[in-house]
């Protein structure tokens, strides 16, 4: 849900 979150794991 965050900036880096979207890049590493967008929706896991």
UniProtKB/Swiss-Prot annotation:
One Gene Ontology cellular component annotation? extracellular region
Task: List the coiled-coil residues.
Answer: none
User: Domain of life here?
Assistant: Eukaryota
Report the sequence similarity comment from the record: Belongs to the periviscerokinin family.
The UniProt entry, under Pfam families, shows: Periviscerokin
Q: Which residues form the signal peptide?
A: none
InterPro entries in the cross-refs: Periviscerokinin
> Where does the record place it?
Secreted
> What is the organism of origin for this protein?
Derocalymma versicolor (Cockroach)
Protein task: Mediates visceral muscle contractile activity (myotropic activity).
Which GO biological-process labels does this protein carry? neuropeptide signaling pathway
Q: What's this protein's name? A: Periviscerokinin-2
Tissue specificity annotation: Expressed in abdominal perisympathetic organs and abdominal ganglia.
């Amino acid at each position: 849900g965050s900036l880096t979150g979207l890049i590493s794991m967008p929706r896991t």
